[in-house]
Amino acid sequence: MLLTHLHSDHIAELGDVLITSWVTNFAADPAPLPIIGPPGTAEVVEATLKAFGHDIGYRIAHHADLTTPPPIEVHEYTAGPAWDRDGVTIRVAPTDHRPVTPTIGFRIESDGASVVLAGDTVPCDSLDQLAAGADALVHTVIRKDIVTQIPQQRVKDICDYHSSVQEAAATANRAGVGTLVMTHYVPAIGPGQEEQWRALAATEFSGRIEVGNDLHRVEVHPRR
């Protein structure tokens, strides 16, 4: 599991993932679930397991083959290599989501293909470097032209530390990636509005543009 930062909308389902992956793993000696995130991740995981302590106890009491709490393996990073197993490498670099700090992005490489997960960030040099030449960049996007028209300042504040569609596309262009996969839309995309968002991205990026949603699948192949 990869966590870019510890905002609630990025970790709210953590408890369900920890418990469900544990209960539905029928291996005799299951390997720990690896979690990679920024500093603070171990504390959040520990607190989450504590919050679900009653549930964990119920399940151990109910199932004879569950005898210990969920096995978890937490790794905290701000930069550099984070994973090298089974032909998959993951590298981490800082992003800019201040005042949330630290925040990180991930570059995942396997079989010559590379995908970068930006998370929430404004444009920054470290993300450009992490994404350089990647086959795909998954980037969160917001419509600042819409959000700035909302009267509540607390809502407008989200423009401070997120990338607009055009900014995310410009990052993809500077980094020379093959495909931009947009995600984490603010406001939510209404039915039939997908092409509006794609057109905004196309003003800054001439490559393949995917309007991603949950469970959206994009095949990535090494570019020659």
Curated annotation (Swiss-Prot):
One of its GO terms (molecular function) is 3'-tRNA processing endoribonuclease activity. Its EC number is 3.1.26.11. Zn(2+) binds at D120, H184. Disulfide bonds: none annotated. CDD domains: arylsulfatase_AtsA-like_MBL-fold. Its cofactor is Zn(2+). InterPro entries: AtsA-like_MBL-fold, Metallo-B-lactamas, RibonucZ/Hydroxyglut_hydro. Homodimer. This is Putative ribonuclease Z. It comes from Mycobacterium tuberculosis (strain CDC 1551 / Oshkosh).
